UniProtKB/Swiss-Prot annotation:
Gene name as annotated: truB
Annotated protein name in UniProt: tRNA pseudouridine synthase B
An annotated Gene Ontology molecular function: tRNA pseudouridine(55) synthase activity
GO BP of this protein: mRNA pseudouridine synthesis; tRNA pseudouridine synthesis
Lineage per the UniProt record: Bacteria, Pseudomonadati, Pseudomonadota, Alphaproteobacteria, Rickettsiales
EC number: 5.4.99.25
Organism, as annotated: Rickettsia conorii (strain ATCC VR-613 / Malish 7)
Length: 345
């Protein structure tokens, strides 16, 4: 079985489920999953996991995402986008200065109430199904993070503004648009929504598909991305034959500090070592470069000899992904084990 990622661009007008069906028809009997459903009226990046890559989907779901969206001011729809019915209007339209200035109010940790027309479940039933039946939907507020928000364009004639945002998982852009409009003493809904990035997957190198006849299986595989690609900014350990066998069979596996831990900071990280031999402790400062700005930022990692704990890292064997998991006092606890070769041992 092939194991890789596909960076697919979902066009507007089809559902994420329909796109999954299209990809399945192209690839045949292969295990497939995707990270982060997009609304029918939305377009943009929808990463696909093939084979063993499906075991890593949860990491992409947690990844930061970027969107470009356009808000129409002066009206509100029941769905928060142009697919819904107009339920309220207001004559107050913000100025260009106000549309730009409001962004700073939303950057940081934000509490957001998801829209009634969402896939969240209420007592086991999808919220959007209840909303379509005209039933009242009450969803609990959620804590999300807006890392960046800026206005790209303001069209006074059409009463619209286009925004760019980088946000955490669980962020509803339709709700963000409504909240922006309310903060400007107006109403608003999304008329265009495009997801431009999910983790490492960007729109400039995405594969665009509208039907199974547009591309062959070989062409898809030629544009595939290696399964380890999304792990490049996560700490990694190399396993010996005996360690790999222990992990493979779910046994307790210990890593030696002196031999294994000095090389944790690899790939996107640069390692700076600072030691205090009297206290027998070490502090690692991992410095990562932000590709979009060229700036670097530090990720502190406190390490005590023989008692190192890491929430998430991956283990490879002979250059191949073996498992992801956590490290507790030098003991590796696997979360997922991968079968990427037929004859591992």
């Amino acid at each position: 079985m092939s194991n890789y990622w596909l960076n697919i661009y979902k066009p507007r007008g089809i559902s994420s489920a329909q796109l999954v069906s299209i990809v399945k028809k192209i690839l045949g009997k292969t295990k497939i999953g995707h990270a982060g459903t997009l609304d029918v009226e939305a377009e943009g990046i929808l990463p696909f996991a093939v084979g063993e890559a499906t075991k890593l989907i949860h990491l992409l779901v947690d990844a930061r995402k970027t969107y470009i969206f356009t808000v129409k001011f002066g009206m509100q729809t029941n769905s928060g986008d142009c697919a819904g019915k107009v339920i309220a209007t207001k004559d107050c339209i913000p100025s260009q200065e106000e549309a730009y200035a409001v962004c700073s109010k939303f950057i940081g940790n934000v509490t957001q109430i998801p829209p009634a027309f969402s896939a969240l479940k209420v007592n086991g039933v999808r919220a959007y199904k209840l909303a379509r039946e005209g039933k009242k939907v009450e969803l609990k507020p959620r804590n999300i993070t807006i890392y960046d928000l800026k206005c790209l364009n303001f069209d006074e004639k059409n009463a619209t503004a286009t925004y760019y945002t980088e946000c955490s998982k669980g962020t509803y852009i339709r709700t963000l648009a409504e909240d922006l409009a309310l903060s400007l003493q107006s109403l608003g809904f999304v008329i265009e929504l495009r997801r431009t990035q999910v983790g490492i997957f960007k729109e400039e190198n995405a594969i665009r598909i509208k039907s199974p006849d547009e591309i062959t299986k070989n062409a898809l595989e030629e544009n595939s991305i290696k399964i380890e690609a999304i792990l490049d900014d996560i700490l990694v350990l190399d396993a010996t034959d005996s360690q790999a066998q222990q992990i493979k069979y779910g046994q307790k596996c210990l890593f030696n500090y002196e031999k294994d831990f000095r090389h944790l900071a690899k790939f996107a990280y640069r390692e700076e070592f600072k030691g205090n031999t009297e206290r027998n402790t070490t502090a690692y400062t991992l410095v990562r470069e932000d590709a979009s700005t060229g700036l670097t930022y530090k990720l502190p990692l406190e390490v005590e000899f023989g008692k190192m704990s890491v929430d998430l890292l991956w283990v490879r064997y002979k250059g191949t992904l073996l498992a992801i998991g956590s490290l507790n006092k030098s003991c590796f606890n696997s979360l997922r084990v991968f079968n990427l070769t037929q004859d591992f041992f």
